[in-house]
Structure formats: structure tokens, C-alpha cells
């Protein structure tokens, strides 16, 4: 699917348009707005996670906590109208303002009907219907807006990205100084990065069959392997040399997922 972002005003960028691709590189001199453009991609992927989707759901359900009945246009307008606030959060600048428009190859009138289904006889799972199709979750979620958010974000992510779930990643500029620190920061992009970094350091209780595949790709990319020792992440090269990730963190200036 083509996803276009029409930029009327975004920092130094005016009257421009970009089409999102699976891999994009923004190059040029400092001050051209490369970081702002990359943040637009992160804004979209983060909007398709349950946490931010819950903001949309809570705004639309009103008094009915069990059912959401909107159209895709409602989500698209919410995304466009909240871009300034979210980029301001990432930048730590509450007065940040921009004018952009996300355009999708989806019908604006596509129905988005989400409904929580009551299960009075069991507390071991939850059910929610998405446009009439029942989704079953192997857990009991008392927060019904969260349940609807998870259901809706899975549906829209599959429509937009052709995959129901994904792990978003944010590598902001000058992040190396924050690795290993115990400080907090009001700047959203560093808070997001540190949260994701902590998640990556935490070992999973369930072994994934894809781990070796990913490990092989990482080894090819960095000519070595990633190891975790005493809660710290290191890159170990084939020569045996080892450096902490904090020392290599700025070798890739900035990265956003798509």
C-alpha cells in the first residue's frame, strides 16, 4: 500500500510530499529537516500500537464503554490532528506546530466497528469483535477500552502494513549519553528510546524460533555478535574485541521503523 505524507509546514520543510517505503535514507546538510521527517514515520507506527490507539478509542467511545463505531476517516483525522502534539512530546517542545496530512490507499468510509463481548461464565479469556469477526484473547482484560484498542490496532496495522503486530524502534540523535544512565528526561524521544532499550535488555521467558535468524542478520550487519553481560549490552567482533553499545550507538545517526 502507498502511504503518502503531504507536508505543508514541518520545521524548515514546506510544500513537500514523501511516499513511505520499507527502507528510507534521508541525507543532506544539517538543518534541512531530516529528523522531523523521520519522526513523521515514527508518529505513524506509534499510533498503531495499543497504548496510543487507546487515546483514540477513549476519545470516540464516549458513554458507551463496550462498543466503538467509527470510520477509517475518523482515525486518519485523529492522526493528522495529533501529529503536532506528538512530535512536540518527542522533541520536548510543547508549543511545536506543524501541518501535515497522512494519505492512505484505504476508503475513508471503511467501517471500524469494535465491540467487547461479555463472558459472564469465565474469566480466563476475553472476546472482542472487529467488523463482525470475533477475536479471542487468552487473558481476561478488565479494561474494555484497552481490549478494543488492541483489537483495533491489530486490524489497522494489518490493513496498513500487512502485519498485525510489529516492534517499533526509535534511535534519536545524541542518544549514547543516555545509555546506562539512571536519569529521567522530559524529552519524549529519549524516554521512548530508553524504554525500548530496557525492553531489549530483558530476556524473554519464551524462546522464539526466529532468534537464531535475527542473530545471523545482526552478525552480518555488525561483523560480530551482540551479547548481554551483567545487564549491559556489548558488540563482540570476530577478532575478539569488545565494545559497549554506548560507544557504538551514534554510528547510526537516527533510525525510524517502517
Model-derived features: positions:
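P-loop NTPase switch/coupling surface
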Residues: 1-195, 201-207, 237
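Short, well-ordered loop/turn elements at secondary-structure boundaries
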Residues: 20, 164-166, 221-222, 229-230, ...
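GG-anchored amphipathic helix commonly corresponding to the ABC/SMC/Rad50 NBD signature/C-loop
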Residues: 41-44, 240-242, 247-258
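Amphipathic alpha-helical segments that form well-ordered structural scaffolds
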Residues: 170, 213-217, 257
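ABC-family P-loop ATPase nucleotide-binding domains
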Residues: 190-236, 245
Amino acid at each position: 500500500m502507498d502511504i503518502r505524507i503531504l507536508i505543508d509546514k514541518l520545521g524548515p520543510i514546506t510544500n513537500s510530499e514523501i511516499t513511505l517505503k520499507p527502507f528510507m535514507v534521508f541525507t543532506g546538510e544539517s538543518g534541512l529537516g531530516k529528523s522531523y521527517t523521520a519522526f513523521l514515520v515514527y508518529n505513524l507506527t506509534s499510533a498503531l500500537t495499543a497504548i496510543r490507539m487507546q487515546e483514540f478509542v477513549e476519545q470516540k467511545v464516549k458513554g458507551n464503554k463496550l462498543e466503538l463505531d467509527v470510520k477509517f476517516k475518523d482515525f486518519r483525522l485523529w492522526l493528522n490532528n495529533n501529529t503536532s502534539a506528538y512530535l512536540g512530546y518527542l522533541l520536548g517542545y510543547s508549543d511545536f506546530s506543524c501541518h501535515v496530512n497522512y494519505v492512505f490507499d484505504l476508503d475513508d468510509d471503511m467501517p471500524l466497528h469494535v465491540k467487547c463481548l461479555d463472558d459472564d461464565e469465565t474469566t480466563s479469556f476475553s472476546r472482542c469483535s472487529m467488523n463482525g469477526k470475533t477475536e479471542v484473547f487468552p487473558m481476561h482484560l478488565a479494561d474494555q477500552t484497552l481490549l478494543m484498542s488492541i483489537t483495533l490496532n491489530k486490524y489497522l496495522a494489518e490493513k496498513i502494513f500487512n502485519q498485525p503486530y510489529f516492534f517499533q524502534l526509535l534511535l534519536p540523535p545524541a542518544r549514547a549519553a543516555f545509555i546506562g544512565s539512571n536519569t529521567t528526561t522530559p524529552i519524549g524521544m529519549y524516554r521512548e528510546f530508553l524504554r525500548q532499550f530496557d525492553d531489549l535488555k530483558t530476556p524473554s521467558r519464551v524462546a522464539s524460533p526466529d532468534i537464531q535468524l535475527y542473530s545471523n542478520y545482526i552478525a552480518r550487519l555488525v561483523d560480530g555478535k551482540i551479547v548481554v553481560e551483567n545487564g549491559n549490552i556489548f558488540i563482540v567482533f570476530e577478532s575478539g574485541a569488545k565494545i559497549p553499545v554506548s560507544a557504538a550507538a551514534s554510528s547510526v545517526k537516527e533510525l525510524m521503523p517502517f
